């Protein structure tokens, strides 16, 4: 194979109004290299992948793959034939093998004809068997089932037209991986995957022999799979040979040499670096340490010190000893049992990470805690001092015609944030909307910017118990890191639905895991500790994702 599978020479891209989103990028990609692409929202990461996939040709410079290289591209919103079933969509990826198997059956049937040209049939049989052998085609059904389980695809006969956006993405990703291209271009491949499927994808891409260029905020992927980090910063492409942890070290050193305005960002990076350097044992004691120092987190002096953080979660009323108690909870939808006999109690200071397949009932639990839905049986008891800040309050009610500042402030110069008052522009600035960005229309925002705006609206309530439903979706790593640091310093409790394992390892003191047939397990510890516990008690197979099974309600 050639030395490089893809080369870019002085590539630039201008977007309205005359903004150079990419400038003078010259890069060469080695065969088999695994590259993670980092950068703030709006830095041009998706644009870079569209250029590499040959979709965006309106560029300066030259972007050229090696001849005969097969490129597979996963956009954020993949297009599938709405008339097809899941099975038909997936089989498109292996159509050569499917057609060969079908034709081989026909050839076998033709042997029964005494007038057949047996030499011609034998030659065709040999050619078909060669195709099938090369792709392990006789085990095709096993391969498809394994891939469908790993990415938790909907039923084979489900119509694409009836699937959610997340389900379509999983089907598109599965199809792409089965195509086995020479180079994979993946735009946020972990979005809409649960933590177990993300871990499976990480192992798959680690063993994949081709080149991978992935935009992702999944830092375990960037640490365990990526051999290169490509950072897009103010239009420049800055390559770094090494994984995420080593990139973080050099980034910290680089920021140390830059202007003092980077001080807050450097402080945020140093907190994450401290966690990385502790190793597994030290990391696992962090959750227990948080519970132990809850009183310190609550002190006014401590909160004042942390107001300079990049993202500051305003404290709500002081929490009493009783936070949340769930007893014998049961909830079904139609004939599906989502939650069966769930009981747990949350201590003050806890941050509970909630994991499990999409559609298992994680968001339903939030709606029951906030009183929007009622359980079939069992009780949910909130402590008297608990003030909820629930993620569903604002998610779908943002006005696209308003500016960022208007959407958060309601046009007020001074805002009430929890129990305190502060200038509204200063509060909005805490969510990395600085200066002119506060004048952007909501409808013009990227997914990550909408995520930050949503957090700004949610957190102004000043609750002491946060319910966060996939807050990490679409956030760039800078904002993710800031959110982690803010949660770790927050003098309250939080329940967080997330598939981001690094995020869960840094913040979670407990894990709530949705499993098959309505079973939900409550565990004290972070995500990695929970994985180790599952391996010890159930064996390594317990970590392999499978399509969810719902217990049916007896009629």
From Swiss-Prot:
Molecular function in Gene Ontology: ATP binding; ATP hydrolysis activity; ribosome binding; rRNA binding; tRNA binding
GO CC field: cytoplasm
Mutation effect (residue 470 to Q): Causes growth defect at 18 degrees Celsius in bipA deletion strain
Sequence ranges assigned to domain ABC transporter in this UniProt record: 6-259, 324-550
Pfam families: ABC_tran, ABC_tran_Xtn
Residue sites binding ATP 1 per the record: 39-46
Record CDD domains: ABCF_EF-3
One GO-annotated biological process of the protein: negative regulation of translational elongation
Domain of life: Bacteria
First-level EC class: hydrolase
Reactions catalysed according to its record: ATP + H2O = ADP + phosphate + H(+)
UniProt cross-references to SUPFAM superfamilies, sorted A to Z: P-loop containing nucleoside triphosphate hydrolases
Residues that hold ATP 2 according to the record: 356-363
PtIM, as annotated region: 242-322
Documented EC number(s): 3.6.1.-
Cross-referenced InterPro entries: AAA+_ATPase, ABC_tran_Xtn, ABC_transporter-like_ATP-bd, ABC_transporter-like_CS, EttA, P-loop_NTPase
Knocked-out gene: effects: No visible growth or ribosome-associated phenotype.
Region (Arm): 95-139
Alphabetically ordered keywords of this record: ATP-binding, Cytoplasm, Hydrolase, Nucleotide-binding, Protein biosynthesis, Repeat, RNA-binding, rRNA-binding, Translation regulation, tRNA-binding
Notes concerning its domains: The arm domain is inserted in the first ABC transporter domain. Probably contacts ribosomal protein L1. The P-site tRNA interaction motif (PtIM domain) probably interacts with the P-site tRNA(fMet) as well as the 23S rRNA.
Function text: A translation factor that gates the progression of the 70S ribosomal initiation complex (IC, containing tRNA(fMet) in the P-site) into the translation elongation cycle by using a mechanism sensitive to the ATP/ADP ratio. Binds to the 70S ribosome E-site where it modulates the state of the translating ribosome during subunit translocation. ATP hydrolysis probably frees it from the ribosome, which can enter the elongation phase.
Subunit structure: Monomer. Probably contacts ribosomal proteins L1, L5, L33 and S7, the 16S and 23S rRNA and the P-site containing tRNA(fMet).
PANTHER family: ABC TRANSPORTER-RELATED PROTEIN, ENERGY-DEPENDENT TRANSLATIONAL THROTTLE PROTEIN ETTA
Protein name from the UniProt record: Energy-dependent translational throttle protein EttA
Organism listed in the record: Escherichia coli O6:H1 (strain CFT073 / ATCC 700928 / UPEC)
Gene coding for it: ettA
